[in-house]
Amino acid sequence: MENKSKYKTIDHVLCVEGNKKIHVWETLPEENSPKRKNTIIIASGFARRMDHFAGLAEYLSRNGFHVIRYDSLHHVGLSSGTIDEFTMSIGKQSLLAVVDWLNTRKINNRGILASSLSARIVYASLSEINVSFLITAVGVVNLRYTLERALGFDYLSLPINELPNNLDFEGHKLGAEVFARDCLDFGWEDLTSTINSMMYLDIPFIAFTANNDNWVKQDEVITLLSNIRSNRCKIYSLLGSSHDLGENLVVLRNFYQSVTKAAIAMDNDRLDIDVDIIEPSFEHLTIATVNERRMKIEIENQAISLS
């Protein structure tokens, strides 16, 4: 279902099993922009909504890309469910549902851009979906390490019955038992499991690390890439960045520029990101961000009025 609105961004609603709904936002290529072969799917990081990536969608659209974003089930954002029931497997289910929807629309040429925790979900999903290339930014490769750094304790080391009810992650209450049980039962938790998922990757892959990232070890990202049997992988560092790519405007702009260059390069079957881009003005980025926040509020208000 497509929700018509006055905004540039198009809101779609996917109905999935259990009468749940996934909201997908579509941004069309800017008029008269360069022609691109691939659509870009943006998989937001944990506790990040679609509208947090308004600026990146604007960068990609200005440079000719058709952009798809979505809010996972049981997460922050517009889709069904609450974050206290989120698991990595639910994140994977949400991604696969979006890809299935794109298949029904005959949108088969696509690259994925995933950040933080969503990168780990994408790594585990690549054997089940067809994509042209993968870009990750501060992508989690060792979930156990990242959780320990973020939460201050290695909760995955505890027996299930000794876990607290909730884990406080950046102000959000993550259901400890359901999340930990899913991690351990389905092998999400360590670097080895990530390597096993990615070993036979045969598509181009660019990984952006941040040199001040305390949640993801750069040497573990390098270890992951060294275990991929393809030679079509490359790592770049976002200098001056921490795991929070939006911590200030300089870091954020570097992130937008870098991944846009990577998308253009990979759309042209290259790993060298020394390419020119069209850069939106600060005014255009501000307008896009404000409009998407308004659109989100309107959608939330419509949902409340219908309930």
UniProtKB/Swiss-Prot annotation:
| Listed pathway(s) | Lipid metabolism; fatty acid reduction for biolumincescence
Q: Could you cite one Gene Ontology molecular function of this protein?
A: acyltransferase activity, transferring groups other than amino-acyl groups
Which InterPro entries does this entry report, sorted A to Z? AB_hydrolase_fold, LuxD
Keywords of this protein's UniProt record, alphabetized? Acyltransferase, Luminescence, Transferase
Annotated GO biological processes are: bioluminescence; fatty acid metabolic process
Q: What is its EC number?
A: 2.3.1.-
Task: List the active site.
Answer: 116, 213, 243
What this chain does, per the entry, is described as: Acyl transferase is part of the fatty acid reductase system required for aldehyde biosynthesis; it produces fatty acids for the luminescent reaction.
Family per similarity comment: Belongs to the LuxD family.
Q: What is this protein called?
A: Acyl transferase
